[in-house]
């Protein structure tokens, strides 16, 4: 496995080190190359993602990212210059976010709900494609537009990916989330595409939720969802709700995928760089380790992925039973690696 590693900023390098520890515990044949990308590089050189580095990244099987950013970088610089550029250059059209409440993890929701879903979010279109503009900026007559771009090609490939994932899961249930009563043009495209692809997956039950209703049900009845497919912006919002109801973004993993394998997919914890605790071994690497499980599964190493996922689940359960003890970042990583290897 040829793995590009972007530790990034703040706690990023610390949690990535433990993710690599766990990865090597189950898959020793890993050839890693580290890249200095993020806020530090921007402060020193003004660069976000040089073309030469982009071409080097292209030659890897996958990318493991820690976290990027610090308060001194203007908003949008790293998001568009690094993260979104990687997404568009490598055609990461599927953003995959598991939403699972592990045994022993407390949810802010009452009643210990059963939560186990995945959100398949379109990653390269919608309002984040960068279309739009500003007229008469700074005047009382300023006009700002952000356009949502949705193509049949882009929608269909994400819908098919979601159906394939639903077809492999026990419940075989797919929910399309959109707002087709107001966003009638894009909503119609999404709804028609789901309806036209559905006959190819006769065992998958399909339903629809408006995004406002889905947001409510994520909180009041999350067990009704199995696989959710949605557009870029709605998925961005729903997945953060999903993280909040399953222990917080500190446990949330994600994958930015090109399912075809033509380009390297990127895996990362959802949390930020947390510069206030950087270098103090206080960060929890669990989300990074869960992202490693997704990386392994994506590259076809299902058995190793299952071992890492089981290690995460057992560690979280034991952690809840142990109470207030707070191991260091390294200690958590060593424990997870031992569980995965054993």
Curated annotation (Swiss-Prot):
NAD(+) binds at residues 272-284. Residues 319-342 are annotated as: Disordered. The record marks 128, 179 as: Important for catalysis. Pathway: Amino-acid biosynthesis; L-leucine biosynthesis; L-leucine from 3-methyl-2-oxobutanoate: step 3/4. Substrate binds at residues 87, 97, 121, 212. It is an enzyme of class 1 (oxidoreductase). Residues 329-342 have a biased composition (Basic and acidic residues). Its cofactor is Mg(2+); Mn(2+). GO terms for molecular function: 3-isopropylmalate dehydrogenase activity; magnesium ion binding; NAD binding. Coiled coil: none annotated. PROSITE patterns: IDH_IMDH (PS00470). One of its GO terms (biological process) is L-leucine biosynthetic process. Its EC number is 1.1.1.85. Residues 319-328 have a biased composition (Low complexity). It holds the Pfam family Iso_dh. Mg(2+) binds at residues 212, 236, 240. It catalyses: (2R,3S)-3-isopropylmalate + NAD(+) = 4-methyl-2-oxopentanoate + CO2 + NADH. Keywords: Amino-acid biosynthesis, Branched-chain amino acid biosynthesis, Cytoplasm, Leucine biosynthesis, Magnesium, Manganese, Metal-binding, NAD, Oxidoreductase. One of its GO terms (cellular component) is cytoplasm. It is found in: Cytoplasm. Catalyzes the oxidation of 3-carboxy-2-hydroxy-4-methylpentanoate (3-isopropylmalate) to 3-carboxy-4-methyl-2-oxopentanoate. The product decarboxylates to 4-methyl-2 oxopentanoate. Homodimer. PANTHER family: D-MALATE DEHYDROGENASE [DECARBOXYLATING]. This is 3-isopropylmalate dehydrogenase. The lineage of its organism: Bacteria, Bacillati, Actinomycetota, Actinomycetes, Frankiales.
């Amino acid at each position: 496995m040829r793995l590009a590693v972007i530790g990034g900023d703040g706690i990023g390098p610390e949690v990535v080190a433990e993710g690599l520890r766990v990865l090597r515990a189950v898959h020793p044949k890993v050839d890693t190359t580290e890249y200095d990308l993020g806020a530090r590089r921007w402060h020193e050189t003004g660069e976000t993602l040089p073309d030469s580095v982009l071409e080097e990244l292209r030659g890897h099987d996958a990318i493991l990212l820690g976290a990027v950013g610090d308060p001194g970088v203007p908003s949008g610089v790293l998001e568009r210059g690094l993260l979104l550029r990687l997404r568009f250059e490598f055609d990461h059209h599927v953003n995959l976010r598991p939403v699972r409440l592990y045994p022993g993890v407390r949810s802010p929701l009452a009643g210990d709900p059963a939560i186990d879903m995945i959100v398949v979010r379109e990653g390269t279109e919608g309002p984040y494609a960068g279309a739009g503009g500003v007229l008469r900026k700074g005047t009382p007559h300023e006009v700002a537009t952000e356009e949502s771009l949705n193509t049949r090609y882009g929608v269909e490939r994400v819908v098919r990916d979601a159906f394939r994932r639903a077809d492999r899961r026990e419940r075989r249930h797919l929910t399309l989330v959109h707002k087709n009563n107001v966003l009638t043009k894009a909503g119609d495209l999404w709804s028609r595409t789901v309806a036209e692809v559905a006959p190819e997956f006769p065992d998958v039950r399909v339903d629809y939720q408006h995004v406002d209703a889905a947001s409510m049900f994520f909180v009041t009845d999350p067990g009704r969802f199995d696989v959710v497919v949605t557009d870029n912006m709605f998925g961005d919002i729903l997945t953060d709700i999903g993280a909040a109801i399953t222990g917080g973004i500190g446990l949330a993993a994600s994958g930015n995928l090109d399912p075809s394998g033509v380009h390297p997919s990127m895996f990362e914890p959802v949390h930020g760089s947390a510069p206030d605790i950087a270098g103090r071994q206080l960060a929890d690497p669990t989300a990074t380790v869960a992202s490693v499980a997704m990386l392994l599964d994506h590259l076809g190493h299902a058995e190793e992925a299952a071992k890492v996922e089981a290690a995460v689940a057992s560690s979280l359960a034991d952690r809840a039973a142990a109470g207030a003890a707070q191991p260091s970042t390294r200690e958590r990583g060593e424990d997870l690696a031992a569980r995965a290897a054993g």
